[in-house]
Amino acid sequence: MAPALLLVPAALASFILAFGTGVEFVRFTSLRPLLGGIPESGGPDARQGWLAALQDRSILAPLAWDLGLLLLFVGQHSLMAAERVKAWTSRYFGVLQRSLYVACTALALQLVMRYWEPVPRGPVLWEAQAEPWATWVPLLCFVLHVISWLLIFSILLVFDYAELMGLKQVYYHVLGLGEPLALKSPRALRLFSHLRHPVCVELLTVLWVVPTLGMDRLLLALLLTLYLGLAHGLDQQDLRYLRAQLQRKLHLLSRPQDGEAE
């Protein structure tokens, strides 16, 4: 295992890369479609119908490219989460295993965002054109996106963000405290194994709630929706644990108010 002087910078570099990628992902999924950053090609009249688009190589080629990028990201994200791969990376990278996973995921997502090919000439599933929808629908989408991202950031902070990013593992190792997950209860570990993406509903809102849903955005939303759905396996025990934890936190938050009332 590398000395602490090397572990800490490596974990911080992974965190900075992930943070920058997260900011770029907000721009890619929200700011660009909501603020008109996707290049147009003559407006709605220049778009083809669905049957014509499915026979047009100039539309199918970028869609196939985008699909390849998404499969690359999903493949990396799933492969490195497999138990055998995690055991191998833990053997050679130790406490940096999670940081390595986060860094590779960020790099794969960077590839998706940087080389994504829009399809402005393709058909759209829906589009807000006529007034007042052309004004109010983008505004409503913007508000929902802002709320969703605020919820995402709040949930990540509550859901042991430092452990998810790999920082806590290195911090505990340097202080000789062992593995962070080893200190959690069996019910918490069970929940974490079922729910490593604790922001599913909010991400789905960001992916689907847009003023214009074109072919490339539809591909992005569909594939990530399927992946998020398959990555979640909550059952009744998990829900009971979440409900108990929520009630416990609310009880703790209400204690100062009870003291003041007395």
Curated annotation (Swiss-Prot):
UniProtKB keywords: Membrane, Nucleus, Transmembrane, Transmembrane helix
Perinuclear space face of the membrane: 29-58, 115-133, 211-216
Alphabetical list of InterPro entries matching this protein: Nurim-like
Cell compartment(s), UniProt: Nucleus inner membrane
Classification via PANTHER family: NURIM (PTHR31040:SF1)
Family listed: Belongs to the nurim family.
Protein name per Swiss-Prot or TrEMBL: Nurim
Organism: Macaca mulatta (Rhesus macaque)
Taxon lineage: Eukaryota, Metazoa, Chordata, Craniata, Vertebrata
Gene name per UniProt: NRM
